[in-house]
């Protein structure tokens, strides 16, 4: 297992509290991708095919064609669709070059099934986003 990938994952806030052994398992599942400016990663109303963790660069998040957020290194998106297999609640487009860690639905499910800490981190992050969307 390349230590480089584990080290990169260890710097992502989502993986805080995850042991090195658990990180090694997650690292064995993930893919790393380089994305071009203007690339649509998730389309509102369409099935979500992947979970993304940004390593560098930024993405714009829109809902109903209106900007709602800008995400950067350490941020992640696509988790809701990974959990419920429903359609995306927003569109996400790269705003310049982006380096990201990507997990397919199967990879994501395997990662959270094997790691209670990671599952709790994802749930906590989802709750935080729901509160932010509700304005509370």
Give residue ranges: language-model regions:
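Cytosolic regulatory regions built on CNB/CRP/Popeye-like sensor folds
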Residues: 1-136
């Amino acid at each position: 297992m390349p230590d480089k990938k584990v080290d990169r994952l260890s710097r992502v806030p989502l993986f805080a509290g995850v042991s090195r052994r658990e990180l090694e398992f997650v690292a064995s599942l993930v893919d790393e991708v380089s994305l071009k400016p203007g690339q649509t990663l998730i389309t509102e109303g369409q099935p979500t095919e992947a979970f993304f963790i940004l390593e560098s660069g930024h993405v714009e998040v829109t809902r109903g064609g209106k900007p709602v957020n800008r995400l950067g290194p350490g941020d992640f998106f696509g988790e809701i669709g990974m959990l419920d297999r429903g359609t995306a609640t927003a569109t996400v487009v790269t705003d310049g070059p982006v380096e990201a860690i990507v997990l397919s639905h199967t990879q994501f499910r395997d990662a959270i099934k094997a790691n209670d800490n990671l599952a709790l981190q994802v749930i906590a992050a989802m709750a935080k986003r729901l509160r932010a969307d509700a304005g509370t």
